[in-house]
A protein has these predicted regions:
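Conserved glycine-rich cofactor-binding loop
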Residues: 9-10
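Substrate-binding pocket helix/loop in short-chain dehydrogenase/reductase
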Residues: 85-87, 93-98
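Residue(s) in the substrate-gating loop at a strand-loop-helix junction
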Residues: 129
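The beta1-alpha1 cofactor-binding region of Rossmann-like NAD(H)/NADP(H)-dependent oxidoreductases
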Residues: 52-63, 91
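Conserved NAD(P)H cofactor-binding loop of Rossmann-fold oxidoreductase domains
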Residues: 77-82
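C-terminal helical subdomain
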Residues: 171, 188-224
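Active-site helix of classical SDR
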Residues: 109, 145
């Protein structure tokens, strides 16, 4: 069995790699930080290939697909966020985020899904966020990218069900997690985040059961339900207050 994990140099990606290695998976780990990837590789027992690559560049996503074939499990995990008033956040950084959080997911999901459907086996885990179920004032672009991942995955899931395919797709939708995401986005969560180890362990456990929505943490499950049943305006107001509190 072979798993391809993007954003594997730290946080959830790193911890999922360790768990899958213990389950016997050979791994292909992708990230931009070679030093951190080498550190992860040292901690893994099974056959591991590391690829240093910036997935915000479209041609690199296609290049990765050409380099790595016969993937049993694809985990799209690379991503980052920005925080601030929409008119004041850096446009270039946001475009880079859209390319990483959306375009890379879209390309890799499409290319590897085609192969998996031909073999009628395989699994894809798209790492989204609870943010994908609600508006996110002061983190507008990030929330929108995660909404794309959620809706794309939901649509693909239905297509696979209608085709009676054995290929499975899932989305991981955590809330705050103690990772480097906070430093990159320049935010500090007002509630304590879950550990990346817990989220990774929970995700793999649910993935093995073919769970589609993987939502770690009771409070985050409640937030997902609340976002669905509450008026959008109310959800936006609550979201705004939460974002305002966590801007450094």
């Amino acid at each position: 069995m072979k798993a391809l994990i993007t954003g594997a140099s730290s946080g959830i990606g790193r911890d999922m790699a360790k768990i899958l290695s213990k389950k016997g998976y050979d791994l292909v780990l992708v990230a931009r930080d070679e030093e951190k990837l080498q550190e992860v590789k040292k901690e893994i027992e099974t056959n591991t290939q590391i690829i240093i690559m910036d997935l915000s560049v479209e041609k690199n996503c296609k290049k990765l697909y050409e380099q790595v074939k016969d993937v049993d499990l694809l985990i799209n995990n690379a991503g980052f966020g920005t925080c601030g008033d929409f008119t004041k956040t850096n446009l270039d950084k946001e475009i880079n985020m859209i390319n990483t959080n959306i375009t890379a997911y879209h390309i890799l999901t499409k290319l590897y899904l085609k192969d998996m459907k031909q073999k009628d086996k395989g699994q894809i885990l798209n790492v989204a966020s609870i943010a994908g179920f609600m508006p996110g004032p002061l983190m507008a672009t990030y929330y929108a990218t995660k909404a794309y991942v959620v809706r794309l995955s939901e649509a693909i899931r239905e297509e696979l069900k209608k085709e009676k395919s054995n290929v499975k797709i899932s989305i991981l939708c955590p809330g705050p997690v103690d990772t480097n995401f906070n430093n990159v986005a320049d935010v500090e969560f007002s509630i304590k985040g879950l550990s990346s180890k817990y989220v990774a362990k929970y995700a793999i456990k649910k993935l093995e059961k073919n769970k589609f929505y993987i939502v770690p943490g009771f409070s985050i499950k409640c937030a997902k339900i609340g976002a669905k049943i509450a008026p959008t305006g109310l959800v936006s107001k609550i979201s705004y207050k939460m974002q305002k509190r966590k801007i450094k």
